């Protein structure tokens, strides 16, 4: 598989999810995204209007965080957030599924939650975030199947948010892993894409994730890693499985 620099950039998603992000932060973030040439930026719903104003003409997809970061919002709240984000110009949606319902084996509730957002998105790409770092293997498999059946176009590993509650479960929360990429790729249909997010800090790991099945990469270190790709491989590299 040949991976060009342009394709690598398009796989990278920049995120600005901090609760304290102000207008100046959004402007700086968008300027960086435009300069680097990433494929997608992801921001909180309240920051969609300014992000659209700054990036709409640059060919960069603009995604809204929905139900962030825990996914425990009522379905009606997620639907309203999605509708407002779409009205403001969002072209994609990153939604957190109802993880508690999944772990409680209330699969119908999980599916209905996703379906509501998919319908509210009106044909825009919906990414279902399943929070792999708190799930068993069986729960990850079930989450992937539910998300695909409910209409998600892409399944994402984690929000990347390391909360106090997460640290109460594990002292070493992991984001994207090679094992999860392989598991998700084996469960999902070929047309359903996978986004690896959380803990991607090196170029080598990013390339390993792509080899394992990742279509998109959510990285806080994206600018640095893109620069390293260009320094090491120039315009592209042949990835050996």
Region locations from a protein language model:
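Alpha/beta enzyme core
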Residues: 2-36, 40, 46-194, 201-241
């Amino acid at each position: 598989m040949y991976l060009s620099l342009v394709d690598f950039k398009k796989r990278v998603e920049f995120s600005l999810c901090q609760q304290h992000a102000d207008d100046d932060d959004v402007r700086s973030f968008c300027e960086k995204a435009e300069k680097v040439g990433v494929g997608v930026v992801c921001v909180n719903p309240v920051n969609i209007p300014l992000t659209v104003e700054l990036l709409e003409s640059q060919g960069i997809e603009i995604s809204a965080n929905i139900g962030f970061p825990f996914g425990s919002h009522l379905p009606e709240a997620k639907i309203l957030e999605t509708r407002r984000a779409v009205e403001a110009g969002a072209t994609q949606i990153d939604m957190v599924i109802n993880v508690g319902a999944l772990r409680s084996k209330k699969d119908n509730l999980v599916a209905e939650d996703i379906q509501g957002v998919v319908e509210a998105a009106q044909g825009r790409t919906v990414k279902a975030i399943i929070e792999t770092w708190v799930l068993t293997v069986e729960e990850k498999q079930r989450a992937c199947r539910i998300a695909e059946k409910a209409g998600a176009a892409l399944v994402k590993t984690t929000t990347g948010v390391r909360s106090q509650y997460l640290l109460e479960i594990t002292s070493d929360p992991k984001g994207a892993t090679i094992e999860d990429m392989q598991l998700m790729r084996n469960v999902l249909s070929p047309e359903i894409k996978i986004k690896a997010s959380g803990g991607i800090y090196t170029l080598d790991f990013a390339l390993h994730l792509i080899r394992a099945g990742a279509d998109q990469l959510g990285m806080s270190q994206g600018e640095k890693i893109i620069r390293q790709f260009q320094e090491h491989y120039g315009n592209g590299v042949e990835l050996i499985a």
